[in-house]
Amino acid sequence: MKALHFGAGNIGRGFIGYLLYKSNYETTFVDIFDKVVDDINKYKRYTVITLSTSKNKEKVENVRAVNLKDSVALEKEVLEADLITTSLGLNNLKSTGELLRGFLKKRSEINDKPLDIIACENALFASDVLKKAILDGADEELKKYLEKSVGFPNCTVDRIVPNVDIEKELPIDVAVEDFYEWDIEKNKVKINNKIIGAEYVEKLDPYLERKLFLLNGAHATIAYLGYLKGYKYIHEAIKDKEINKIIVGFHSEAVQALSEKHKIDIQILKEYSNKLLKRFENEYLKDDVSRVGRDPMRKLSSNDRLITPLKLCCDLKIDFTNILFGVASGYLFNYKEDEKAQGIQNIITKEGIKKAISNVSQIKEGDYLNNMIAYKYEELKKQN
């Protein structure tokens, strides 16, 4: 089986590529950075180093790469692939879909061999986003081919892959935490139903929101509060008593909302929550708060990790005091080397916090939640 993975970064190599190798796929990475592409083609292997109390090293072999700009090589890979996956950020799915559209049109004219396309992004229903980008502008013949031969299962992906400074044999070796989870929509898969380490589930919604709220939302909150208190790493910030109390409260609020919405046993959610809190404390990861907090413009958007649980709690009349800390602290994330963070700060400086909340989180000025976020923002600002 042949796999084509867009995005040869740490997640691509250390998580998706790692599991595809364990499942006996011949994997080709696609990336825009010449150095990464050249290194993968030079070494044709890399090591995945697991960071925990004992370091474990596993080789990933039989890999190669093509440059995103090499349309001839890329077309050949799309024509031959049994599976296409991505880990390049939600914002890049539209352009990726537009690129794939032409290659899939060519493939449809040659054969109707089944294919699965899975967007492995930190977002809700990312494969649907990619599918829409491909369908927009597709002719009727291509639409029929996609309906018949191509599966677009949504998924959740969960593995912390920090930019930690470790001793490497090769520049493309990658360090990861020892936990991972990949949940895939079972009923939309065409042929790739035996990926080792992946769980195929009937209903994905609870898994998506559980992960988005309890991992991504809480993780970002630790980063933003940790930044305000001057911590460098996540494991340091979560040990701060005040931050820890907020994160435990964040989880408690989100767990209640998830249980009520999806009818999940609250005890199962609490067990998942406890596992996550231990993962956040993993000092071997040395996960920088600036990395975890990166791109608050996206993380504070209306359908992402902080605003979604906030709105759900509000709708269900569940207390959201601690989730509010996460949102407000995100608007105070003023990391100078983060272009998106500076973009938010510029809006706040020129037009005020309420306008920034309206622009970034799509919560209108005058709305109850806009006022609540703005109030908490001003409160935190005075304290820091």
UniProtKB/Swiss-Prot annotation:
Keywords: NAD, Oxidoreductase. NAD(+) binds at A3, L4, H5, F6, G7, A8, G9, N10, I11, G12, R13, G14. Gene3D superfamilies: N-(1-d-carboxylethyl)-l-norvaline Dehydrogenase, domain 2, NAD(P)-binding Rossmann-like Domain. One of its GO terms (biological process) is mannitol catabolic process. It comes from Clostridium acetobutylicum (strain ATCC 824 / DSM 792 / JCM 1419 / IAM 19013 / LMG 5710 / NBRC 13948 / NRRL B-527 / VKM B-1787 / 2291 / W). It catalyses: D-mannitol 1-phosphate + NAD(+) = beta-D-fructose 6-phosphate + NADH + H(+). Belongs to the mannitol dehydrogenase family. The keyword NAD applies. HAMAP family: Mannitol_dehydrog. GO terms for cellular component: cytosol. GO terms for molecular function: mannitol-1-phosphate 5-dehydrogenase activity. This is Mannitol-1-phosphate 5-dehydrogenase.
